[in-house]
Amino acid sequence: KFDEAYEYYKQQILAGKDADVIVFETMTDLYELKAAVLAAKENCDKPILTTMTFERNGRTFTGVSPACAAVTLTGLGVDALGVNCSLGPDELEPVVFEMSKYTNLPLVIKANAGLPDPNSNEYNIMPDKFAECVCSLLKYGVKVIGGCCGTNPDYIAKIKSEVADKEYQPQTKSVDTTVCSSTTVVEI
């Protein structure tokens, strides 16, 4: 239930009152994420970053599209939104692109190092390729970059060296007025 989720997140927010930032990540359900964001907005004044995890079909496990996530989370007043886990940075480009069409907020990407081999459990994207793929997403307004499953400090170091001479490119385009459910966006 929404109220129960809200109370759960409220308790966490209050317990972590000394945190610098609130991060909700690896979310699949937009309704739950709404409860979390509202609990944070109503119980602290910290910046809020949110990421959802998307499948190969471009939707979360519960069917949320990147556009619906972007519209809803922008409307809720988060400070940044994006994607983490599930896939490699190359496979997440369509997700990041779709989000960028519906928000001017800074985007977050914390991709996996690809997908693990079912036999060896080794991830298939090495640090150089990972950093290259992640950096190709900067054009969509990505400001927060990291790594999730299969990454390690070598990946983050490579990203750092790749972005050292690049400036954040905020999105300044006009974003159409929209309404949405958790699965469909309608432009007005």
Language model segments and positions:
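Domain-level signal for soluble alpha/beta catalytic cores
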Residues: K1-I188
